[in-house]
Amino acid sequence: MTLFILTETSAGYALLKAKDKKLLKRDDLATEASTAEGVSNLLKLKSFQKFDSAATALEEVASLVEGKVTPRLASLLDEVKDEKKVSLAVADPKLGNAIGKLPGLSIELVADSSTTDVFRAIREHLPTLIPGLLPQDMSTMSLGLSHSLARHKLKFSPDKIDTMIVQAIGLLDDLDKELNNYAMRVKEWYGWHFPELAKILNDNIAYARLVLKMGMRTNWESSDLAEILPEEIEGAVKAAADRSMGTEISQEDLEHIQALAEQVVGFAEYRQQLAGYLTARMNAIAPNLTALVGDLVGARLIAHAGSLTNLSKSPASTLQILGAEKALFRALKTKHDTPKYGLIYHASLIGQATGKNKGKMARVLAAKASLGLRVDALAEWDDDATEEDKAALGTEARYNLERKLAAMEGKPLKPRGVAIAPNGAPQAQKFEINEARKYNADADAVTGDEPASAKKSKSKKLVEEVQDEEMADAADSDEESDSSDEETDKKSKKSKDSELEKLAEKAGLSLKRYKRKLERGEIQFDAEGNPSAVSKKDIKKAKKEAKKSAKGEEKKRKRTDDGEVDNSEKKKKKKKKGEE
């Protein structure tokens, strides 16, 4: 069987023919193929199909990585169709399966470990097998193709858009930490000069802006603080600056303090821009998740999972406790209760719930968020789809969850049957005018014209079958007897109930309790017939006493019986002695 070897290079496809049909079964293959002369003695070039450009090479190699047979490769394999009993060695088993499915191609494919030595020798001595191919050109083409293939993979990566959210939420957290550190440093530094300001003004950003605006506290008269502070706080700040107990500082100290305050104000402004950017990205990438849990919580969930695709693959139970891994494994190790929520705890819906309802809302919210995530990650939308259409599932689910939370908390429910705005708030539906019903004049009738029988029973049929008089009389008599029996039963029940009510009142019990105790045997009647309730303990004592008395009577009976037997035996003995 003739052996052909398919080799994919950065320059093109090479189809090599083995001079020895049993090449793959030889034991000395590795030693003979170690040199260029040995490889040229073992293999011969059948045909070579060169790539036209670098773009063509990238398309061909990308399709080979996915296990697809391109038209260029199929045309190369057509040269082997006419030959009989042919085997083809391929390096990739995935590509071998795709070649085996080509119509009209009867080739035995070999893609196992026996081909590794052959392909290693071909890669080392490829320029000797293909005439006109220089080693320098081969290395340059391989390097360019590898770079192009790497860019192609990054360009079409499904996780590429998630990196923006992951980096943005990480930077937002870092900015919050730095802002807190810098703001506290400004307060401590400027507090030596104006210590009363920290007690009056709690906002860090307003504090930094005031430091930039006023500078020395002695400039309080000439500085206009109306742009930064309201009138009440402005008056308190100026009054405190007038009688401050702080120390004096130099102009150089103030410059350094103001430089740090500028950093605080700049970080605060950039943080607002970054928060707006993150909100826009979350609404574009994961609109349903954002509608349910918010942009910050959703971004933290995506960052913790690594990507939107990974987060969408996780079930609702994992989503619920995502971020609480330490507490989860600690609880499993110590055999305590597992945590109910992780990062999802900071969602507004869970924050609105109280006490016991937080765990329920976390479970339900995680279930709805997992559904919304799968829509965000896997749904394919048309170009005409709006943001409201993409976030419809999450908005409707949030509205239903708010109704459920209100029902659990005992608050008034939101109205049903209303349209839902993009922000989740209910809004009025479109008002539609339906055509009025026409008045049917033929249905009118005068009430006085109806006969007496029609007035009494309007639901009778228009046509009825009339039975014989005897049958009618019998039926009437049966009905009368049945009705009379029912009336007597009702009267007897009423009389029994009234008697039971009287007895229950005498016993000092309700009717239900009296009936229950009567069934259990806990009601006793005196000589006059008045009922009285007896406790279970008294009944048990009475039963025990009855058992004791019964046992005593049995013993007495046995004694009397034994005495009678002894007397009869004595009499018999006396009679026998007299006869003797």
Swiss-Prot record:
GO terms for biological process, alphabetical: box C/D sno(s)RNA 3'-end processing; endonucleolytic cleavage in 5'-ETS of tricistronic rRNA transcript (SSU-rRNA, 5.8S rRNA, LSU-rRNA); endonucleolytic cleavage in ITS1 to separate SSU-rRNA from 5.8S rRNA and LSU-rRNA from tricistronic rRNA transcript (SSU-rRNA, 5.8S rRNA, LSU-rRNA); endonucleolytic cleavage to generate mature 5'-end of SSU-rRNA from (SSU-rRNA, 5.8S rRNA, LSU-rRNA); protein localization to nucleolus; snoRNA guided rRNA 2'-O-methylation
Family in the record: Belongs to the NOP5/NOP56 family.
Protein task: Required for pre-18S rRNA processing. May bind microtubules.
MF annotations from Gene Ontology: snoRNA binding; snRNA binding
Keyword Cytoplasm assigned: no
Gene that encodes it: nop58
Source species of the chain: Aspergillus niger (strain ATCC MYA-4892 / CBS 513.88 / FGSC A1513)
Biased composition (Basic and acidic residues): 495-505, 547-562
Ranges for domain Nop: 285-410
Comp. bias regions, Acidic residues: 465-487
Domain of life: Eukaryota
Matching PROSITE patterns: NOP (PS51358)
Protein name: Nucleolar protein 58
Localization, UniProt: Nucleus, Nucleolus
Skewed-composition ranges (Basic residues): 570-580
Pfam families given in the database record: Nop, NOP5NT
GO cellular component: box C/D methylation guide snoRNP complex; nucleolus; small-subunit processome
SUPFAM superfamilies: Nop domain
InterPro entries: Nop56/Nop58 (IPR045056), NOP58/56_N (IPR012974), Nop_C (IPR042239), Nop_dom (IPR002687), Nop_dom_sf (IPR036070), NOSIC (IPR012976)
Keywords noted in UniProt: Nucleus, Ribonucleoprotein, Ribosome biogenesis, rRNA processing
Region (Disordered): 444-580
